Amino acid sequence: MASKKGNRIVIKLKSTESGHTYTTEKNRRNDPSRLELRKYDPIVRRHVLYRETK
């Protein structure tokens, strides 16, 4: 039986400097555009910009 498509989806956040990725969830209704967050990148050992990828 197919379930109803929910508002929350799993996305990948990719570092703009090293290529490191985080996975997180976002709400389709509240955040329809691509997400950009500053998070810690363990490869370059500092906070950098992470952008949502498909």
Curated annotation (Swiss-Prot):
InterPro entries: Ribosomal_bL33 (IPR001705), Ribosomal_bL33_CS (IPR018264), Ribosomal_bL33_sf (IPR038584), Ribosomal_zn-bd (IPR011332). PROSITE patterns: RIBOSOMAL_L33 (PS00582). It holds the Pfam family Ribosomal_L33. The keyword Ribonucleoprotein applies. Transmembrane segments: none annotated. PANTHER family: 54S RIBOSOMAL PROTEIN L39, MITOCHONDRIAL, LARGE RIBOSOMAL SUBUNIT PROTEIN BL33M. Belongs to the bacterial ribosomal protein bL33 family. This is Large ribosomal subunit protein bL33. It comes from Chloroflexus aurantiacus (strain ATCC 29366 / DSM 635 / J-10-fl). The lineage of its organism: Bacteria, Bacillati, Chloroflexota, Chloroflexia, Chloroflexales.
